[in-house]
Swiss-Prot record:
Needed cofactors: Zn(2+)
CDD domains with a match to the protein in the record: EcFpg-like_N
Catalytic reaction(s) noted: Hydrolysis of DNA containing ring-opened 7-methylguanine residues, releasing 2,6-diamino-4-hydroxy-5-(N-methyl)formamidopyrimidine; 2'-deoxyribonucleotide-(2'-deoxyribose 5'-phosphate)-2'-deoxyribonucleotide-DNA = a 3'-end 2'-deoxyribonucleotide-(2,3-dehydro-2,3-deoxyribose 5'-phosphate)-DNA + a 5'-end 5'-phospho-2'-deoxyribonucleoside-DNA + H(+)
Gene3D superfamilies per record: 1.10.8.50, MutM-like, N-terminal (3.20.190.10)
Gene Ontology biological process terms from the UniProt entry: base-excision repair
Listed name of the protein: Formamidopyrimidine-DNA glycosylase
Family per record: Belongs to the FPG family.
Gene behind this protein: mutM
Organism encoding this protein: Wolbachia sp. subsp. Drosophila simulans (strain wRi)
Primary role: Involved in base excision repair of DNA damaged by oxidation or by mutagenic agents. Acts as a DNA glycosylase that recognizes and removes damaged bases. Has a preference for oxidized purines, such as 7,8-dihydro-8-oxoguanine (8-oxoG). Has AP (apurinic/apyrimidinic) lyase activity and introduces nicks in the DNA strand. Cleaves the DNA backbone by beta-delta elimination to generate a single-strand break at the site of the removed base with both 3'- and 5'-phosphates.
NCBIfam families: fpg, PRK01103.1
Length: 271
């Protein structure tokens, strides 16, 4: 599943390519994703101009004139594909956004766990109302993290992945951030020291920023709208490295399951 860095890369690409473009048509080939695509999406968006594109958590948001917002989540396998001319549609091209200059954005999602909805301004605010803090903001710090987690009994990795606490830090970047901070994913979130909260907040920011700079992580499905792959996976310390030696100490990387998710860590470096 694309996480914060991948969605940030996608949103930045789209901001450059489709901001101030007018939507001429929306073609829906499959209305049933994890939730139905907004009824009458074509009528709602035809003639609207994209005024801004931003990210919230793992969602990309296209704000249009008329105070409408296109909310897109890529699910497990979704992609947004940028085309500069008419492009033959593929089996899993569920939604095509056509622009007046004949460019288009295609939402492709083989597993159909994605989301494409249109909301007004008030609905957009309510949709994201219970989301946690954005980890790349100035507010996100050791002090903030300590206050946020001081009473949380859950293990620290699960806490980092709780969207109501912190948005966008999925399985990959939680594992990598904890390794960089040298903190075991098994530790209760409330039991870290202040210095550990401070270190972890910094390493979450560093890991996410490094991944964005690398274009995200391409493991299976993810690609940028241009078709280019990300390459942050080449810099992984622990994720997907089970039974391989740790890059720091040569200890063998361990794989466990936490809340149904794979967790990779070095039990020598992380404590």
């Amino acid at each position: 599943m694309p996480e914060l860095p991948e969605v940030e890369v996608i949103s930045n690409f789209l901001l450059d390519k489709i901001k101030n473009k007018q939507i001429s048509n929306v073609i829906v080939n499959n209305w049933n994703l994890r939730a139905p695509i907004t009824k009458n999406i074509d009528d709602m968006l035809k003639g609207k101009v994209i005024r801004n594109i931003k990210r919230r958590g793992k969602y990309t948001i296209w704000n249009t004139d008329g105070s409408m917002a296109v909310i897109i989540h890529l699910g497990m396998s979704g992609k947004l594909i940028y085309a500069e001319h008419d492009q033959a549609q593929n089996k899993h091209d569920h939604v095509v956004f056509l622009f007046s200059d004949n460019t288009s954005i295609i939402f492709n999602d083989p597993r159909r766990f994605g989301l494409v909805i249109v909301l007004n301004k008030e609905q957009e605010i309510n949709f994201f109302d219970d989301f946690g803090i954005e980890p790349l903001t100035d507010e996100f710090s050791g002090d903030y993290l300590q206050e946020l987690l001081k009473n949380k009994k859950a293990n620290i990795k699960s806490a980092l992945m709780d969207n109501k606490l912190i948005v966008g830090v999925g399985n990959i970047y939680a594992s990598e951030s904890l390794f960089r901070a040298r903190i075991s994913p098994l530790r209760p979130a409330k039991n870290l020291t202040y210095r550990e909260y401070e270190k972890l907040a910094a390493e979450i920011k560093n890991t996410l920023s490094d991944a964005i700079a690398a274009g995200g992580s391409t493991l299976k499905d993810y690609a940028q709208p241009s078709g280019s792959a990300g390459y942050f996976q080449n810099n992984f310390y622990v994720y997907g490295k089970v039974q391989k030696p740790c890059k720091i100490c040569n200890n063998i990387i361990t794989l466990i399951r936490q809340n149904g998710r794979s967790t990779y860590f070095c039990n020598a470096c992380q404590n």
